[in-house]
Structures are given as structure tokens and as C-alpha cells.
Design a protein with these regions (language model features):
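Alpha-helical transmembrane segments of integral membrane proteins
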Residues: 2-3, 94-127, 143, 166-306
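N-terminal signal-anchor/signal peptide hydrophobic helix marking the start
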Residues: 6-16
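Residue-level signal for discrete positions within transmembrane alpha-helices
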Residues: 12, 93, 97, 133-140, ...
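Membrane-embedded alpha-helical segments of multi-pass transporters/permeases
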Residues: 16, 20, 24-29, 144, ...
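Hydrophobic alpha-helical transmembrane segments of membrane transport/permease proteins
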Residues: 16-64, 158-174
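Membrane-water interface segments at the C-terminal ends of transmembrane alpha-helices
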Residues: 23-29, 66-68, 133-162, 180-182
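Membrane-interfacial helix-loop-helix junctions in multi-pass membrane proteins
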Residues: 51-59, 75-83, 164, 187, ...
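An internal, D/E-rich "acidic patch" concept
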Residues: 56-113
């Protein structure tokens, strides 16, 4: 296992370097910059600001300096918010996104897995068709559309739920549903198809022939193997939920990482874009690694490929 983990960490380092290089190149290749097209600012002031942050230097020089800062844990200063660093945004935004993400993750797991199990056990019946119809709708509708519909119905029309912030338990309801809608639908469909496949295996028929109840067959024999495909996709799902949904956080004015990222994109705040991208990529890779390890532990038939 140690060799497997070390190999994956080496691969992650290479992938992270490529992500940093590509993102940095794209940010600095886009016409204009964080200080261009600013109304009422003389050209001399713009040039002075670019010189202050080293944006007047050749791109390779800027990249090497940026890598040096990253090695010291410094994501740089924000170009748009005086006195603020990207580390400040991550330090303040990550806990907010993580808190919202944990609530959403609990909602997703407690909803999607039972939905998938029930649909599989009622295969072909009205319960199955109803649940899969809901799941199909949830997969096809984007999160920002769901968020807008929820705000219109429950905030504007019924006036029963707040539309911004995370001040009370009620304020979690709309963003959690908007963020988790796709994941619930996708995992429910995956859980259903996986359980149906497992229920058709020979060892399940053998368990039934021994006189085990359907509940025992499902919980003791089928469910563990049926969860393996679900666990496989949990890595990116958990990473996406815990780091926040960019659009949903912006719509509900939740000051998480996604909220800062959207603002940085619209304002061309290069360092914030880079910092949030690197943070998200690193967290995603770490979650995928943890899921791979857990994947091998839950199914002894799978061996670590060192």
C-alpha cells in the first residue's frame, strides 16, 4: 500500500504542476489584465501597478517567481482587494464552503442511496418509474436553474425561506437542495443500476435458495458490492461539495470559495483565480486518492497496483 500511495502522490505532483502551468499560461494569455480598462485611471498609474506586482516582467520570470511563492505556501496578494491575500480568501471561504458542503453531502447520501435501493427493489413498478423520472429531471437541470426556481417559489411567492447567507438552519435548505440536486439524481441512478446488476449474480441466487429473507440478501450480500461504483465517484463528488458550488454560492451570496472565485473571474484577479484553482485541484486529488484506498479496502479482490 505504501508503494501505491507514493506512486499516486508522485503522479499528483506532476498533475498539479501541469495544472499550475496551464492555468497560469491561460490567465496571462488573455488580452488585457487586472488593471486595464479601468475607467478614470491614467496610463501611468496602470503601468505603476503592473510594475508593483511584476506583471511587466516576461511570463517565464513571473511563473518561476509564482512557483517560488507557492513552495512557501504563499498564493500571492489580491490585485483587486488592497491588503488582502489569496490565503485570506481561502482561510475565510474554505470553512464556509466546507460547512455547507458537509450538510449537502449528508443530504445527498441520505437521499440518493435509499432512492436507488428502493428503485432497484421495485424494478419496473410505479415507484421505480417515479423515482427515476425525478432523478432524470435532477440530472438534466443545471444547479443555477434549480436555485433560481427555488428562490422564486419559496422566497418570492411563499416567502418562507431566506435567499442569502447562512444565518440560520432555514438558510441552508435552498442552497443544499440546489447544490445536491444533481449528485442525488446521479448517485440514485448509479445505485439502482449497480444493485440490479449485483442482484442478478449467482451468489445472490444461492443466498435466496438457502432461505434467507430478502432483507438479509440485500443488506448482507448485495449492498456492499453494489456500493463499490458509488464509492468510486464519491471522490470528485465530495471534493466538489466541500469546496462549494461556484454558481450556487454566488446566487445565494454565500461567502465561500466559489463566491470569491466568481468575483475574481469577473474582475480578472489572476492570483485569486490561480489560488482557488490550485486549492480545488489539490483537494480533488486528495479525495480521489482516499477513495481509491477505501475502494481497495472495501473489496479485498482488488489489489494495489504499485
Amino acid at each position: 500500500m505504501v508503494k501505491f500511495i507514493l506512486k499516486r502522490i508522485g503522479t499528483m505532483i506532476i498533475a498539479m504542476f501541469m495544472i499550475i502551468l496551464i492555468t497560469f499560461t491561460l490567465m496571462h494569455s488573455i488580452p488585457g489584465g487586472p488593471f486595464t480598462n479601468t475607467k478614470g485611471v491614467p496610463e501611468e498609474v496602470t503601468q505603476a501597478m503592473e510594475a508593483k506586482y511584476g506583471l511587466d516582467q516576461p511570463m517565464p520570470v513571473q511563473f518561476v517567481k509564482y512557483l517560488g511563492s507557492l513552495l512557501h505556501g504563499d498564493f500571492g496578494s489580491s490585485y483587486k482587494y488592497t491588503g488582502k491575500t489569496v490565503n485570506d480568501f481561502i482561510a475565510t471561504g474554505a470553512p464556509v464552503s466546507a460547512k455547507l458542503g458537509l450538510v449537502t453531502l449528508v443530504f445527498v447520501l441520505l437521499t440518493s442511496i435509499p432512492m436507488g435501493i428502493l428503485a432497484a427493489l421495485k424494478n419496473g413498478k410505479w415507484q421505480d418509474m417515479l423515482l427515476m423520472a425525478i432523478a432524470t429531471i435532477g440530472v438534466t437541470i443545471p444547479s443555477f436553474v434549480i436555485a433560481s426556481m427555488l428562490i422564486y417559489v419559496f422566497s418570492f411567492k411563499l416567502n418562507v425561506l431566506p435567499t442569502f447567507g447562512l444565518d440560520s438552519w432555514k438558510s441552508y435548505i435552498l442552497p443544499v437542495i440546489a447544490m445536491g440536486g444533481y449528485s442525488v439524481s446521479y448517485l440514485a441512478r448509479l445505485m439502482r443500476s449497480s444493485l440490479l446488476e449485483v442482484m442478478g449474480q449467482d451468489y445472490i441466487r444461492t443466498a435466496r435458495a438457502k432461505g434467507l429473507t430478502e432483507f438479509a440478501v440485500v443488506t448482507k450480500h448485495a449492498l456492499r458490492n453494489a456500493l463499490i461504483p458509488v464509492i468510486t465517484v464519491l471522490g470528485p463528488t465530495v471534493a466538489g461539495l466541500l469546496t462549494g458550488s461556484f454558481v450556487v454560492e454566488k446566487i445565494f451570496a454565500i461567502p465561500g470559495i466559489g463566491y470569491y472565485f466568481v468575483n475574481s473571474v469577473t474582475q480578472r484577479d489572476y492570483t485569486t483565480i490561480m489560488g482557488v484553482t490550485i486549492f480545488f485541484a489539490a483537494f480533488l486529488m486528495a479525495m480521489v486518492l482516499l477513495v481509491d484506498i477505501f475502494y481497495c479496502l472495501i473489496d479485498p479482490r482488488i489489489k494495489f497496483d504499485a
